[in-house]
Every structure is written in structure tokens, then in C-alpha cells.
């Protein structure tokens, strides 16, 4: 088994992306592997020898779009006192039931498959001994029709349901239903295996289980057949389309090949449909490749020619690395619009790899059109040029210089100069700059940007461009010198000996005419070069070239795409992709312009010094382990854009409990470009579409951390504004002095955080609002040494810790921030994997829920008013008219909230009172309450 596993590891092709695999390892060493056609023979030689030696193997094949008809009859029964006989006999079916199931399959084929022949009905039955699995006795068998291949979707949606109907209606000779002693619905035992991997012959699901073995081969008439007789009717083929030799002597040994579910060179039948299905050969797999056609065909051909030249300069080692190999493929796919010429270029370049597999290239190419067009189409010539520049800048520059006539052919210098086009105007010079810096610079509505290898950074001065102008000028000066040498050389050689014969004079005359023509052309080129040099070295004319560069480098979608991908976040040294959960180099197509303030250090571990210091810090901030775990579980979402859980987090405590230090740690990690502190007015005032709101404008551009701090005692949060900021919907965005027509909406990507000692009142909150709120209590207290308990155990019990006055030093904060970034990514990856496989569950700690319940009670404005203004007596003779209550409520509200006017009218207030105290429409007063005279006294004071 280890030998087979190592074989797959060694031959596993780079050409198969993670979703593309052909075989699955089960048992103690699970995994998915891709087996290329070229490794097919070597694999079966090894596999057959292991099966023949009865070595436990656990390998299954992935089913293709075209599959043989397979049957899996899985019988099991719980063993108790009533059916103890079964435990003793260990028999759940007999030969009669087996033959009956085969007949149901064959009858279904006859009724639903088009143009079937007798050999299509040949069925291989595979069985193994019954076994106990806990309280259950399990037994069953597999069926395999080696000559009958059908479209998988039609097997799933047509054949299997028909078989189940046939099994349900079938009656044995005694009149009993199939498996009547086990279940009244025998069709339930027929499993649909079209979406499952199929065990190879000789393999089992785990090392401790026995494999299924051939017990019988049935003909179309249910007559037993010899193995050689059954497998010699039609030829079988390897994945390389070579015929397999079947003899009486070797038929048992090569059963794993004969019972493979590979569809190569198999005859595929239709299921009651006139549509003709083609045999899936390699040629068939290539049928989707398109020819170059359409209005842009000339542009496509030109780009493909350039791409072919650039691939000659590109480092061939990239063909061995999957990500860059796939990127080059998608680049060529986009350049060539998926045409066959583009594929041919990619296929040839892929052959530089030692792991080259033409089958994988075809399959991956055909899958590329399934990619998200928003992100795949933006990889084109610019991305290819970037790759080449990274690998061979000198070679790329030489290629561009040659394209634009900056390199002379010394072997045929005169002809080369005469054909030379000197760039004396803005347009060709701008095109040259585009070829040199495409993918590295871009001009957008927001100005110039340059790509630094990780992000796009704004550029104020195009210094590189002006330096390049000087470089081109130097090239032209060298050409001017060579032209002068040619002209003077011709003049020196123009004389002829007067004594030459007439034939030589005739030849000399024609050479002088040709030389004169060349001299005229050379002089014209000389003047053009002088004009080009003057243009390239003059500041004013350089500006004209740069203006034309703005036209060629302009990308109208750049500003809209910038920082709009919520699944990408840039560290200082690369990009983390939350779709693939991997850290990688930045790409131009990431369209990121901001980085976190830290580097991602994947060398850190749980035992690293800075990570241990972080764990110690968090354990003091949150002594309660459940609160700490919940805090980290929620806060790890900070890097992923958006607020998919729709949570508003409140950090609260009485002071000196670490809120500010924790916030500073997060600001150090995230950085000023991706974290902003906002005015509390954003939450206390209604967000008005169309009105200028500079605070909201600050949240654009992929901001990940929005903090509301320094709350006033009388400020109230509007639940509507809170819902808008946490709902994930687009927000109106208009800056000061910006025209309404220039404003635009944006989708927020930040996590909302409120930091306060006392929670501000939440106004008009509904259940949906409360569902979003998470109150994180900061319970610790950081005190001076004289107030701090001596032992660590006592400190944690009392939640009193020594105040570390040095923790906010820059180097300490940066070290903790780097560890925090690594830790949050680690937690997010673990959490996301659970989300994707459906096992993620979050438990909100009781302390967090209790804090929210207390907050809800505080925000009940009517309860707050009644508590301060009235006394509950439970005496029904005591009553307060609604009119008097409303007058008192208005006065109380103005005094309690710094002169703010009441937003409830009288009718709304009375309705709120009736709903809270379950009163009817006929009630005009609230009974059981009386005026609190202490409230009057406090007002007088």
C-alpha cells in the first residue's frame, strides 16, 4: 500500500488542479490524485501485482461524464432477539435474489437504452462475505456491466429510477417481494452511485475490510459465463488508446484493467433520445477548441504572435509550478478567446515541464470557460508582460526595443536603416512606453498608479518614464552616429578608376545610383533622428508624450475594481486569498491598493516567542476562556471584506481594563489605510441618501476596521443607522462639495466596533437589531503594583493584573501585531474549513448574552421613564391619565437627553404604553402607578 501511495505521489501531475483528480485513496492514508495516461501501464503493473499478492489496497476511481452501468445493493439489518437467526446464519440474500436484481437491471436496459446488443447485457456480479458493523449485520453485492457505457446524468435521472421501479414491482417464484424479510421497500437498497467514486477491483474501503470479488458473470439470458468468454467479445483499451491483450492465462490478473470505469474508446449508447453521443477519445475532448473568428481576429492573431515570442523569454521553470502554469494558460485563453491556436501555444510551452501531461492540458483548458469572468478576463497581455519582466527584464527590454526599431541589424545595416521608422511624434513613443510598462503602470480616473509587486500605489511623478525617454534618446544618438559613418563611408568609396572597361563602368553607374538613393534616405533618417532626440530631451515635448500615454494606459474600470474584492487582503509581503485560503505573491489582477501594517510570517508557530506573548496578553484581557474564544472566533473575520454574519461588536468596561490597548494593537496590525475612527454622529443621526457625508466617504476603498469611540453620556444610537452599516447592502456616498451626479454607492467591507465605558442608548431597536449586537465585556482591571495580587493564580481569580506601562512601545506593539495577524489567519482558516464542510457551530457565551439582555433593558425608553417618574403601587385606585403621562414624558426626555426633542407624537406614545402593559383601546389611563415625588425634588435641586 505504501509503495502504491508513493507511486501516486511521484507521478501526480502538475496539470491537474485541486478539483481535477482521477483516483482516490481510502483507508488510513486518504487523498486525491491525478493519474496521467502516460503512467497508466506502470500503475496497473504495480497494482495488479499487489492484488495478486493479496496486499490490502484501498483505491477508487472517479467517475467520468460517461460511465458503465453500475449497481450497488447494500443490505443491512439490526440484530436483536427477533432476528437472532440471521446472526447465526449470516445470510441476507440468496442466488435467487441476486439473479432477480440482475434481471431487473437487464430488463431496464432493454426498455430504455437505444440500440443495445446482447453483449451490452453481460453483467459481472461481485460479492463478499457478510460482516457485523456494530449492531448491524451487513451484506450486499456490486453489479458491473463492462460493455454498457451511458451518459452519467441519464443514468442518474432515468436508468436508476427505472431500476428501482422494476425492483419494487418484482416478485419471486413464491410471490414474495425482494428482500421481504428485511424491508417492505426493496428499492431502498439500490444505491445511486453516479456521484461516488467506484472501488477498483481488488480494493476495499479500509485495510481491515475485504474487497468485493467476482462470484459470477451473467449473460443476457442469465446464463453463467466463463471469464475469458465474457471479456473477449469486444476489445478493451488503455488510457493511451492501446488495445489490451486478453488471454485465458492472463484474464484473472488483468481484471482491475478490464473492470476499470475509464470511458476511453468505449461505445456510448443513448437513453431513449435521438441525440448521438460521441465516443470520448482525446480528439473528442478537444472538440470544444474554437477557431479564431470575429471582428477582433487580427488583434487576436497579433497578440498571440507577441505572446509566443514572450514565452521564449519567460523562465521555463514556471511550467513546473502549478499556479504560474495555470496563470499562463488563462492569460493565453483570454488573449485568444479560447481558440485552438492559443491552446497550441500553451500546450507546447507546458511540454517544458518534466510532468507534462497533454490530457491534463486539454481538460484544464476546457474548464477555463467556467471561471468567474469578472476576475479571469482581466488577465491578459499585461499580466504576461509582467511575468516576463520579473524573469528576464533585460531580455524583455531588448524584445521591445527590437519591436520599435531601436536595434540595428549590423549584418545588413543599410537595408535595416532604410526600413527604420523613427518615432518623431507622440503616438509611437506612447506605444513604446505602453509596451515597456504595461502591467506595471496604469492611468485611471484617480490618476497614475504603479504596481510594486504586491499592490497598486498612486504615483505623482512619472520619473521612470522620463528616464526612459533619455534611454531612447541615447539609442537614437548611437543610430545617428552609425548613419554618419555609413554616409561618409559611401562617399569615400564612390570614386571609380577611369581605366575600367565599359562593362565595369555600367555596373559602377548603377551602384552609384543605388548609393545616391541610399544616401538620400539616410540623410532623411538623420534629420528625423535629430527631431526625435530634441523631442525626447525637451521637458515641454515630453509632457505631450505623457499626455498621449494617459490615453494608452487608461483603464476605465480600474477605479471601480480597486479594493473591491472582499476575499483578498494585502500584507506588506504578499496577498492572502480567502477563497483558496492561501498566502501568495500579489498580482496586478488582485487590484489592491492598500496593505496591512504587518508582514505575514508563515514561519510562526504556537510555540514562537511573540505568539506566546500574544496568548498571555489575550488571557489577561479575557480571563474567561469562553469569552476569549468567542472574541477571537468573531474578530478573525476582520481580514475578510464584508460583514457576512451581520454583527456589530461593542467593547465595554469600567476603565483600565485594556480596551484602548487592545484597540491600539488592532490599529497597529491593520494600519491607518485600512482602519478609521469615525464620528459617533454616523450612528446617532439618520443616514440620508443624497446628502454629503464625509464620514461615510472615509469607509470606501476596502476599509476593514471602523471604530466609534468617545461616546457622550446622552448620545443615542439610531437602530436604523446601525442596521444600514451592518446589513451588507450598498451605502450612499457623497463627499463635501461633490456633485450629486458624481456620487456613487459602495458596499461596506468594514467590521463595526463601538468602544465605550457605558453603553449608549439604542433607539427604536427591533429584534433584527438586537440579533446583530454582541457585547464583549472587558472584565479585567490593570492596576499599579501595590494594588496587584502577588500570585498569578490570585490575579486571575480576582481579574486584577499588573499594568504593563511599556506594552504600547512601538517595537512591542509591532511584535504583538505580527503575531496577532498570523493567529487570526490561522483561526479563520480552521473556521472556514468547518463552514465549508457544514460542521461549524458557534456558541455565544452566557456573559455575552447576559450583557446584551442588560443593554436591552437599559434601552427600553419607556421602562427608563417609568422607573424615574412613577412608583408602582398595584393599587387600582391609583391611576395616571395618558395625557398627563405624555406631558411628563416630553419634559423628562428633554431633561434626560440634553434638550433633544421628542420624536414620538402623543398617539404613538399612548400606543407604546398600551402595548407594553397589555391595555385595551378603551383604557384611558394606567392603573397601579402614582407620581414619584422624589423626581420633583431632584428637579427642584
Curated annotation (Swiss-Prot):
Disulfide bonds: none annotated. It is an enzyme of class 3 (hydrolase). Keywords: ATP-binding, Coiled coil, Helicase, Hydrolase, Nucleotide-binding. Residues 492-514 are annotated as: Disordered. Its EC number is 3.6.4.-. It comes from the Viruses. GO terms for molecular function: ATP binding; helicase activity; hydrolase activity, acting on acid anhydrides. SUPFAM superfamilies: P-loop containing nucleoside triphosphate hydrolases (SSF52540). This is Putative helicase 121R. It comes from Invertebrate iridescent virus 3.
Amino acid at each position: 500500500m505504501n509503495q502504491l501511495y508513493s507511486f501516486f505521489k511521484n507521478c501526480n501531475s502538475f496539470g491537474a488542479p485541486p478539483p481535477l483528480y482521477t483516483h482516490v485513496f481510502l483507508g488510513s492514508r486518504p487523498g486525491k490524485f491525478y493519474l496521467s495516461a502516460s503512467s497508466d501501464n506502470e500503475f496497473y503493473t504495480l497494482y495488479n501485482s499487489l492484488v495478486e499478492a493479496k496486499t490490502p489496497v484501498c483505491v477508487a476511481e472517479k467517475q467520468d461524464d460517461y460511465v458503465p452501468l453500475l449497481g450497488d445493493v447494500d443490505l443491512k439489518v439490526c440484530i436483536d432477539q427477533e432476528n437472532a437467526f440471521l446472526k447465526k446464519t449470516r445470510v441476507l440474500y440468496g442466488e435467487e435474489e441476486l439473479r432477480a436484481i440482475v434481471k431487473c437491471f437487464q430488463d431496464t436496459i432493454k426498455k430504455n437504452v437505444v440500440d443495445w446488443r446482447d453483449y451490452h447485457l453481460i453483467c459481472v456480479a461481485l460479492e463478499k462475505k457478510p460482516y457485523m458493523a456494530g449492531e448491524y449485520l451487513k451484506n450486499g453485492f456490486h453489479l458491473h456491466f463492462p460493455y454498457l457505457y451511458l451518459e452519467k446524468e441519464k443514468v442518474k435521472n432515468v436508468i436508476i429510477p427505472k431500476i428501482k421501479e422494476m425492483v419494487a414491482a418484482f416478485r419471486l417464484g413464491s410471490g414474495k417481494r425482494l428482500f421481504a424479510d428485511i424491508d417492505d421497500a426493496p428499492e431502498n437498497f439500490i444505491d445511486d452511485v453516479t456521484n461516488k467514486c467506484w472501488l477498483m477491483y481488488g480494493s476495499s474501503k479500509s485495510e481491515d475490510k475485504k474487497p468485493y470479488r467476482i462470484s459470477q458473470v451473467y449473460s443476457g439470458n442469465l446464463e453463467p459465463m466463463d471469464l475469458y468468454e465474457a471479456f473477449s467479445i469486444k476489445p478493451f483499451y488503455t488510457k493511451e488508446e492501446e488495445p489490451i491483450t486478453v488471454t485465458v492465462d492472463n484474464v484473472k490478473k488483468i481484471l482491475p484493467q478490464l473492470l476499470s470505469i475509464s470511458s476511453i474508446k468505449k461505445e456510448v449508447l443513448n437513453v431513449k433520445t435521438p441525440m448521438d453521443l460521441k465516443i470520448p477519445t482525446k480528439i473528442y475532448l478537444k472538440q470544444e477548441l474554437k477557431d479564431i473568428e470575429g471582428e477582433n481576429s487580427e488583434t487576436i492573431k497579433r497578440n498571440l504572435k507577441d505572446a509566443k515570442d514572450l514565452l521564449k523569454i519567460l523562465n521555463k521553470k514556471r511550467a513546473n509550478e502549478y499556479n504560474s502554469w495555470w496563470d499562463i494558460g488563462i492569460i493565453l485563453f483570454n488573449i485568444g478567446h479560447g481558440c485552438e491556436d492559443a491552446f497550441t501555444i500553451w500546450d507546447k510551452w507546458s511540454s517544458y515541464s518534466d510532468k507534462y501531461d497533454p490530457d491534463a492540458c486539454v481538460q484544464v483548458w476546457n474548464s477555463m470557460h467556467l471561471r468567474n469572468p469578472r476576475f479571469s478576463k482581466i488577465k491578459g497581455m499585461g499580466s504576461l508582460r509582467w511575468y516576463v519582466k520579473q524573469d528576464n527584464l533585460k531580455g524583455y527590454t531588448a524584445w521591445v526595443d527590437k519591436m520599435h526599431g531601436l536595434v540595428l541589424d549590423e549584418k545588413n545595416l543599410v537595408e535595416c536603416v532604410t526600413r527604420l521608422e523613427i518615432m518623431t511624434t507622440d503616438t509611437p513613443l506612447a506605444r513604446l512606453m505602453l509596451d515597456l510598462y504595461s502591467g506595471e503602470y496604469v492611468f485611471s480616473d484617480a490618476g497614475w498608479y504603479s504596481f510594486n509587486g504586491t499592490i497598486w500605489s498612486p504615483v505623482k511623478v512619472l520619473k521612470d518614464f522620463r528616464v526612459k525617454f533619455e534611454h531612447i534618446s541615447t539609442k537614437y544618438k548611437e543610430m545617428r552616429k552609425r548613419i554618419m559613418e555609413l554616409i561618409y563611408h559611401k562617399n569615400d568609396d564612390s570614386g571609380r578608376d577611369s581605366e575600367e572597361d565599359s562593362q565595369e563602368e555600367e555596373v559602377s553607374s548603377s551602384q552609384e545610383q543605388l548609393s545616391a538613393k541610399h544616401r538620400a534616405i539616410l540623410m532623411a533618417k538623420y534629420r528625423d533622428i535629430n527631431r526625435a532626440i530634441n523631442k525626447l530631451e525637451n521637458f515641454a515635448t515630453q509632457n505631450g508624450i505623457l499626455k498621449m500615454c494617459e490615453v494608452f494606459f487608461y483603464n476605465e474600470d480600474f477605479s471601480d475594481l480597486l479594493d473591491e474584492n472582499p476575499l483578498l487582503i494585502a500584507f506588506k509581503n504578499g496577498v492572502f486569498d480567502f477563497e483558496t485560503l492561501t498566502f501568495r505573491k500579489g498580482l496586478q489582477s488582485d487590484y489592491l491598493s492598500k496593505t496591512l501594517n504587518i508582514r505575514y510570517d508563515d514561519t510562526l508557530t504556537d510555540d514562537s516567542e511573540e505568539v506566546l506573548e500574544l496568548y498571555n496578553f489575550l488571557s489577561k484581557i479575557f480571563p474567561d476562556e469562553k469569552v476569549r474564544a468567542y472574541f477571537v472566533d468573531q474578530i478573525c473575520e476582520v481580514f475578510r471584506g464584508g460583514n457576512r454574519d451581520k454583527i456589530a461588536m461593542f467593547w465595554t468596561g469600567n476603565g483600565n481594563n485594556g480596551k484602548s490597548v487592545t484597540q491600539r494593537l488592532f490599529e497597529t496590525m491593520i494600519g491607518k489605510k485600512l482602519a478609521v475612527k469615525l464620528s459617533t454622529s454616523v450612528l446617532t443621526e439618520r443616514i440620508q441618501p443624497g446628502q454629503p457625508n464625509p464620514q461615510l466617504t472615509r469607509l470606501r476603498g476596502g476599509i476593514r476596521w471602523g471604530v466609534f469611540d468617545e461616546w457622550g453620556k446622552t448620545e443615542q444610537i439610531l437602530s436604523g443607522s446601525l442596521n444600514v452599516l451592518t446589513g451588507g447592502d450598498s451605502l450612499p456616498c457623497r463627499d463635501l462639495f461633490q456633485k450629486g451626479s458624481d456620487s456613487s454607492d459602495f458596499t461596506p467591507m468594514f467590521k463595526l466596533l463601538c468602544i465605550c465605558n457605558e453603553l449608549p442608548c439604542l433607539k427604536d431597536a427591533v429584534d433584527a437589531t438586537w440579533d446583530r449586537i454582541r457585547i464583549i465585556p472587558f472584565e479585567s482591571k490593570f492596576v499599579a503594583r501595590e494594588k496587584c495580587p502577588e500570585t498569578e493564580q490570585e490575579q486571575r481569580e480576582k481579574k486584577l493584573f499588573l499594568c504593563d506601562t511599556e506594552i504600547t512601545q512601538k517595537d512591542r506593539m509591532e511584535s504583538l501585531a505580527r503575531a496577532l495577524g498570523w493567529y487570526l489567519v490561522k483561526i479563520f482558516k480552521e473556521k472556514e474549513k468547518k463552514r465549508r464542510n457544514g460542521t461549524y457551530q458557534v456558541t455565544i457565551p452566557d456573559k455575552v448574552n447576559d450583557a446584551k439582555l442588560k443593554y436591552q433593558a437599559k434601552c427600553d425608553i419607556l421602562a427608563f421613564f417609568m422607573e424615574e417618574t412613577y412608583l408602582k403601587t398595584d393599587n387600582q385606585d391609583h391611576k395616571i391619565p395618558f395625557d398627563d403621562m405624555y406631558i411628563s414624558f416630553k419634559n423628562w426626555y428633554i431633561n434626560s437627553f440634553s434638550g433633544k426633542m421628542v420624536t414620538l407624537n402623543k398617539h404613538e406614545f399612548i400606543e407604546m404604553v398600551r402595548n407594553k402593559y397589555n391595555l385595551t383601546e378603551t383604557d384611558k389611563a394606567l392603573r397601579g402607578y402614582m407620581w414619584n415625588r422624589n423626581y420633583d425634588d431632584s428637579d427642584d435641586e
